[in-house]
Design a protein with these regions (language model features):
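Glycine-centered, phosphate/nucleic-acid-interacting loop/turn motifs that mediate DNA/RNA or nucleotide
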Residues: 359-360, 583
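Structured, non-catalytic alpha/beta "coupling" segments that mediate domain-domain communication
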Residues: 31-71, 227-274, 393, 453-502, ...
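Intrinsically disordered, low-complexity regulatory segments
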Residues: 1-193, 197, 287-290, 499-500, ...
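Basic, low-complexity terminal or inter-domain segments flanking catalytic cores
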Residues: 2-3, 98, 145-146, 242, ...
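Metal- or metallocofactor-binding catalytic centers and their adjacent structured scaffolds
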Residues: 275-327
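C-terminal or mid-to-C-terminal helical accessory/interaction module adjacent to the motor/catalytic core
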Residues: 103, 110, 158-255, 317
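Short hinge/gating elements
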Residues: 1, 85-91, 200-220, 313-321, ...
Length: 798
């Protein structure tokens, strides 16, 4: 028997439909038939000599690294004296609710002659197959115990799957991919587990900050990527907070020529700034006041005689512009996310995954490559006329170069991972138009981007005029389109032009010649430094992708460019989601704001560069990538992590650095937040009016009580009397089974100086629903506190 391990059920169905000769069921019917069974079996003489084939899926990541308490019971409790937590050997465990499927996988692996890794072809897909193979015992550190091959396909079309099965690969490269991913996971576990515990414990010890461990009110956590990603938002918040409106002046000129009027911008002299923040830097032609420019105009070394000008240079060039690169996950998420109003995660897990897995219309969308192989280029070349018709063009519009352009085609860079392009499945125009709008927009965008390979380059005529006025020179640039080339593909999709066709500030110019004289009018133009805008989902993603480009170290800059920023295109959306769930940021109307908890974490960690700056990611990712290349090892990489955690390194390690960071941070601005957070974590809703202690609601109780009014079961059985008598029912209404339970906010309002709740709507009364305010009072006759209602006559129903 041959067992294929797929990553998801959709893959299993795609493989089965491509390989099973006698299948008559649709994908939906197959899904319904086999989803509970967990696998599909069949025979086909065309594959593996007719041997029984089992295709089973892993339900994504089926295994996870064990928790600290799985190694040692002492590690379950959060204590500083147990840090750093470093297991002798890292081990996996089966995720909850996936044990049943894992047992099936192991059973089929045990019975099979050969196993085929048929998961996604990225490092996480390889990690899934590798870790399951280790856990089931068919693979260990010395190598495979059975024959293991790899199915390497980047589109789920029958043709490509059939070709891939006939050309199964060795697993050597995928093992290196998997070890890289495994090493990253272990390193992130070590850093996150130790730093999160240390920071939480230190903040609780020094300032009393305590958050509910459920995370519902926020979470104190540290991660190699997510903390640095948070700092991108923190730095933008600082820039907004510290922004000082600034006005400056630049020099413009209007020139009168016999053939008309044109404008020019002053070309700054090669001199440095003499004062201010830019002192010593090359002058950019700006002045802090209009008066400064008025004086400079009179200076014969700058301008001098400013009434007349002479055209000293006039150049006309025919220029070409390449189209954008083919789509990779980064670019498709940014451009189409902005167009469709979706987050990066939604673009990937929505239209992209459906077009790939279900519709089979685009290649693997998680690819980070924007190259294709020569073989795929030739296939797309044959498909180009049919693809062109789907977006309103014909074969006559296409141009097929004699040889592929290396800008798109690279066998070395496009062989394993292809750019996102259409597959060999070409739907009819009617089928495309029948697609849901989101899928149609994404699919047509991929077609257009791909067809740019078979359209001429955009050509334009650029005219540059240099006009001499006294000692000064002014530059004027104009552009005239000559051949729209590939840009015609986007003329009917204006919303896609942003980021594809750059808007030029140049313009068509009047006809002039060198040595023509002109009349000049010089005008200092007022400019304003703009306040930095708040990050949105798309600008934050771009900041993640370009993080580290402003580092001082040229080598680190090169590394950050190579690794394409923080995280991966597939994980960045999830990182933002996690930051929101952790209550570090608040998203309002698409804009990202730093929360008080986010501010507190950033203020604490701002000087700990490993946790706040992109250099760490650059160095880590460079070292990790060498594992996949075979030039580095997991052992060597983790040795450095252990040193940072304090092994054989008593100073300048993680724990010591965090202790110092908490000690030197001023938490005075966060006192109100800290008090509120502690109250929530302790379940405190307010202060007892009798003794001043905390009032709480236990579990699903309908009674709010002073903490000194609460007795344990043992105390009640022993006949103990509460120290404080304060408690009250927290339900309102007059119909027994329809009473409203007050929210925590409403209970807090009752116990605050405010003394009553906001308006509570639709309270059930004997004569129908009504609206009322609730307030707390003492019933002297009964000797108890109770909630009373003040009916709102203006809004209550009659």
């Amino acid at each position: 028997m041959i067992t294929y391990l797929a990553e998801k059920r959709d893959q299993v169905i795609a493989y089965y439909m491509a390989l099973a000769a006698d299948n008559t069921l649709s994908a939906t019917q197959l899904d319904e038939k086999y989803k509970k069974q967990g696998y599909i079996q069949f025979k086909n003489a065309a594959y593996h000599n007719g041997e029984l084939i089992t295709i089973i899926w892993a339900q994504g990541h089926m295994l996870e690294l064990k928790e600290p308490e799985d190694y040692k019971a002492d590690w379950k409790e959060w204590r500083l004296d147990t840090l750093p937590i470093i297991p002798e050997k890292f081990e996996y465990k089966v995720m909850t609710q996936k044990e049943w499927q894992f047992k099936k996988v192991k059973d089929f692996f045990d019975k099979s002659r050969m196993i085929v890794w048929a998961t996604d072809i990225d490092r996480e897909g390889s990690h899934i197959a590798y870790s399951i193979s280790l856990m089931t015992g068919i693979l260990d550190q010395e190598g495979p115990k059975k024959m293991i091959k790899s199915l390497w396909v980047d589109e789920l079309t029958p043709t490509k799957i059939q070709e891939g099965v006939k050309k199964l690969r060795e697993i050597d490269y995928r093992v290196l991919q998997a070890i890289e991913a495994q090493t990253r996971a272990i390193a992130d576990w070590l850093l996150g587990m130790n730093a999160s515990r240390a920071l939480s414990l230190l903040l609780e010890d020094k300032i009393g900050l305590k958050l509910d461990r459920s995370g519902k009110d926020g979470k104190i956590a540290v991660g190699r990527i997510k903390t640095v990603a948070l700092f991108l938002i923190y730095l933008r918040e600082l820039a907004i907070r510290d922004f000082v409106p600034t006005t400056y002046w630049e020099l413009e000129a209007t020139f009168e020529h016999p053939n008309g009027i044109y404008k020019g911008n002053y070309v700054p002299l090669d001199i440095p700034y003499s004062k201010g923040d830019k002192k010593g830097e090359p002058w950019e032609g700006d002045c802090p006041t209009r008066e400064d420019w008025e004086k400079l105009i009179q200076n014969p070394k700058i301008i001098g005689d400013s009434n007349k000008g002479v055209i000293v240079e006039h150049e006309v060039e025919l220029k070409e512009k390449r189209p954008p690169r083919l789509y990779c996950l980064d670019s498709i998420q940014e451009e189409l996310g902005k167009l469709l109003g979706l987050t990066a995660k939604e673009v990937l897990e929505g239209p992209c995954q459906e077009l790939y897995e279900v519709r089979k219309l685009i290649t693997y969308p998680r690819s980070l490559s924007f190259y294709i192989s020569r073989e795929r280029y030739e296939t797309l070349k044959q498909q180009a006329p049919a693809l062109a018709r789907l977006v309103g063009f014909s074969e006559e519009d296409l141009v097929f170069p004699e040889r592929p352009d290396g800008f798109f085609v690279n066998d070395k860079k496009g062989a394993n991972h292809s750019a996102v392009v259409p597959t060999t499945v070409i739907p009819t125009e009617e089928e495309v138009e029948a697609l849901p709008d989101t899928l149609k927009i994404v699919y047509k965008a991929v077609i257009r981007r791909t067809l740019t390979m078979f359209f001429p380059k955009y050509q334009y005529e650029q005219t540059t005029i240099i006009t001499q006025v006294g000692a000064g020179k002014f530059r004027t640039v104009g552009q005239v389109p000559k051949n729209p080339g590939w840009q015609v593909l986007f003329q009917d999709s204006a919303s896609l032009l942003d980021g594809v066709i750059e808007e030029s500030e140049a313009r068509d110019l009047i006809k002039v010649q060198t040595n023509d004289t002109v009349t000049s009018h010089l005008v200092p133009a007022e400019r304003h430094v703009k306040k930095p805008p708040r990050h949105t989902n798309s600008t934050w993603l771009r900041a993640m992708r370009t993080a580290g480009r402003d580092l001082d170290d040229e080598e680190l800059i090169a590394i950050m460019k190579q690794i394409k920023g923080l995280g991966t295109a597939a994980t960045r959306g999830a990182i933002l989601d996690e930051i929101v769930v952790n209550k570090w940021v608040i998203v309002k109307q698409g804009k990202i704001y730093l929360s008080e908890l986010g501010w507190l974490i950033c203020e604490t960690l701002k000087d700990e560069r490993v946790l706040s700056q992109p250099e760490t990611t650059a160095i880590w990712e460079q070292s990790l990538s060498k594992i996949a290349e075979g030039t580095n090892t997991q052992e060597k990489f983790l040795r450095n992590i252990y040193r940072y955690l304090g092994i054989e390194n008593p100073h300048n390690n993680l724990i010591e650095n965090l202790i110092n960071a908490v000690d030197r941070t001023d938490y005075t601005p966060f006192q109100d937040f800290i008090e509120q957070a502690v109250a929530k974590a302790d379940g405190k809703l307010g202060n007892c009016p009798l003794c001043g202690k905390a009032v709480k609601v236990l579990g699903k109780s309908k009674v709010a009580q002073c903490e000194d009014n609460i007795l344990s079961k043992e105390e009640r059985e022993a006949g103990a009397t509460p120290v404080c008598s304060f408690n009250f029912w927290i339900t309102v209404g007059f119909i027994k089974d329809k009473k409203k339970t007050l929210t925590k906010k409403q209970i807090s309002d009752l116990l605050s100086d405010k003394g009553r709740t906001n308006l509570i709507k639709n309270i059930e009364g004997k004569y129908g629903p009504f609206d009322a305010y609730a307030y707390l009072s003492f019933n002297e006759e009964k000797g108890i506190y109770q909630v009373n209602l003040e009916v709102d006559k203006a809004t209550s129903k009659k």
